[in-house]
A protein has these predicted regions:
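Alpha-helical substrate-recognition element adjacent to the catalytic core
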Residues: 2-161, 252, 256-260
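C-terminal cap/substrate-recognition subdomain and adjoining C-terminal extension
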Residues: 101-130, 134-303
Length: 303
């Protein structure tokens, strides 16, 4: 009598891991983390340029030519460097970044936020920090807080074989900033990678609903709008030394561009930290809900 071969059990379906457990805090730089534009701590003192004169010249030429204000300032800065017969290489610009001064509490902010997210989520969620700035990448490469950031996106010069800045290779202005939100959203964080191909929402590593954008003014409106329209959050900060910045924040609230604003004081226990933590709590709850839903679908064999 022939024996029936043993029945083989069907292999259990491979477990699909839950990977959308990252939140992103995305910062403008000038006026958000620092009281003044980065050039005013670095290049201008080196060249003896009066900030108010330089920015007035940029604004006048932009109005006259109808050109892009960021391209205009980058070109004028190269001309000023040449006129002063200065040699500001990439390395020199990085060194000048040591003169940048931050709002109170910025240096300890990132580690505090990381600890809060890890503790509050029981280790489920990790925080990442990004800079998206119209300022100069060559300066931002030298900032003392750079190691806290996953990526730093900023305008950039081409340097010739003499290490002289010749022309811009990357220009980030108010509206082009938004492409970097989609890079973070899709996990295509290297500038050369295309972000135009369709990617299903479920495959995007950092949903917009897990993002917080922090800025200081009207130049941040495109990023604030995109972030909020796609389910994320936006906060504005104002400089206590500049009363006009508070009025800008009030206008942003009235236009529903932001969720909150606060004084640019990043120290522990201050209003900015409390309001950011409130948003982080919402995102952490979202991630927990999404993870449980993922596990439920796995149980149902629906993944």
């Amino acid at each position: 009598m022939s024996q029936r071969p043993p029945t083989r059990r069907a292999a259990a379906p491979a477990e699909v891991p839950f990977t959308r457990n990252t939140l992103a805090l995305i910062y403008d730089f000038d006026g958000t983390l620092t009281p003044q534009p980065m050039q005013e701590y670095t290049v201008f003192p080196q060249l003896g340029i009066a900030p108010e004169d330089f920015w007035a010249e940029v604004n006048a030429e932009t109005r006259l030519t109808g050109g892009d204000s960021i391209l205009t300032y980058m070109r004028l800065l190269v001309e000023k460097i040449e006129a002063n017969k200065a040699h500001l290489s990439r390395a020199a610009l990085r060194r000048l970044a040591s003169g940048i001064r931050y709002f109170p509490g910025v240096e300890t902010w990132f580690e505090r936020i990381n600890r809060y997210v890890a503790t509050r989520s029981g280790g489920l969620v990790q925080a990442r920090h990004y800079i998206v700035s119209a300022g100069l990448s060559e300066i931002l490469e030298g900032i003392s807080i750079k190691h806290h950031f996953e990526r730093v996106y900023a305008s950039q010069y081409h340097f010739n074989h003499h290490e002289v800045a010749c022309f811009p290779t990357i220009v980030i202005n108010d509206t082009s900033k938004t492409q970097y939100l989609f890079r973070i959203n899709k996990g295509r964080e290297t500038p050369g990678e295309s972000i135009n191909e369709y990617m299903p929402e479920a495959q995007r590593p950092i949903p917009f609903g897990h993002m917080v954008y922090l800025g200081d003014g009207l130049t941040d409106v495109p990023c604030m709008t995109v972030t909020k329209n796609y389910g994320g959050f936006a906060i504005a900060v104002h400089n206590p030394a500049n009363p006009a910045s508070l009025e800008v924040c009030r206008a942003l609230v009235a236009a529903e561009r932001i969720d909150y604003f606060a004084l640019a004081d990043y120290r522990s226990g201050r209003k900015l930290e409390k309001r950011v933590r409130t948003i982080l709590d919402v995102i952490i709850a979202r991630v927990a809900f999404e993870r449980e839903k993922h596990l439920f679908k796995a149980e149902m064999g629906a993944l």
